Amino acid sequence: PRSKQRIIYRAFPSWFFDVQGSKPLMLEENEKINWFPGYLKHGRFAKNIEQAPDWNLSRDRFWATAMPVWKGDKGTVKVVGSYDELFELSGVRLEDYHRPWVDEIEFEIDGEHFRRIPKVLDCWFESGSMPFAQLHYPFENKEKFERNYPADFIVEYVGQVRAWFYYVHCVNTALF
């Protein structure tokens, strides 16, 4: 490091996407993609899938999309699926669902008090959600999404095969 100070590594509890369990389906779905140049299909992209570790979805930061996960004082975990569901649970609607405002939302279910875990999503999760999130699917535009998914054509810089396109493939293979 420039400062000559030692770096301290700390382990934090994290949330992971099970890439290992998804690899067979990800490789199967890769066979349906008409790659150009063709060597990417069984080369760079397939090798990236084969060698990928599980994906750490959570980050211990302030700036990013808040993970919609609340934990109860008895240990129950509640993943909230929409702003409407969060309103039903808490009675609170926000103008902005980022930190610190979303962190203030608490609610009770069957006598158990829930607080949001203070984690945010890896930015690649949002990037990988582009095919459906751009249409606000499944909350709106269901027919338009279903008519147009999956995409017929994607143009991207070859370096994004390892990054953006991998995460698009990862998220969408798991969901659809």
List PLM regions with ranges.
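Structured secondary-structure scaffolds
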Residues: P1-F176
